[in-house]
């Protein structure tokens, strides 16, 4: 079933790509979560064993330099967001785009952009949950999504935000309590 889910969700996994391995793994982050990890000839994917949700995939044979070599970053982002809306619409609606300058594009030579990577952080009560959300990579030349990862702690509990003080109030409190001042030694 996990293999079927991955094949149906990931356009780059073709009928000719054989499943070579399958493992049931316990999630390292959530003790009640189990994952099916399927290795294909040229790809990898993982699925939540209880819900059937696609959690990740990577097409490691897709490094094409043929095709839409002019795919813009904006078009690649549209493609990524369309995929996220299809695969995980409720979670995607709780996320916001975050541009990470270090990982946005991949180059094989100066000026040679081969892939665009996009990150989306989960938001809870208007606050970014940095280690939760999505990362997705689009190959510029083929236009294919070559990597997807959903890292989402379903069992996470969040404290209420009622009565939370502002950043400025917190700074003033610490400043008053600690008595910070300039000193010369």
Please describe what each predicted stretch is.
Residues 1-185:
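Long, terminal "pre-/pro-" and other extracytoplasmic accessory regions
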């Amino acid at each position: 079933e996990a293999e079927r889910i991955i094949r149906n969700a990931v356009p780059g996994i073709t009928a000719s790509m054989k499943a070579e391995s399958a493992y049931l793994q316990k999630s390292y982050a959530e003790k009640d979560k189990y994952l099916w990890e399927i290795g294909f000839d040229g790809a990898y994917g993982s699925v939540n064993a209880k819900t059937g949700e696609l959690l990740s995939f990577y097409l490691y044979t897709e490094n094409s330099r043929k095709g839409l070599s002019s795919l813009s970053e904006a078009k690649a982002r549209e493609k990524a967001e369309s995929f996220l809306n299809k695969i995980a619409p409720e979670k995607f609606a709780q996320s916001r785009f975050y541009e990470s300058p270090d990982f946005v594009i991949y180059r094989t030579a100066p000026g040679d952009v081969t892939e665009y990577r996009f990150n989306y952080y989960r938001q809870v009560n208007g606050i970014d949950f940095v280690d939760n959300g999505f990362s997705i990579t689009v190959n510029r030349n083929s236009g294919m999504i070559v990597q997807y990862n959903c890292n989402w702690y379903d069992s996470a509990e969040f404290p209420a935000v009622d009565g939370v003080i502002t950043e400025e109030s917190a700074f003033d409190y610490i400043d008053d309590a600690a008595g910070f001042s300039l000193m010369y030694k």
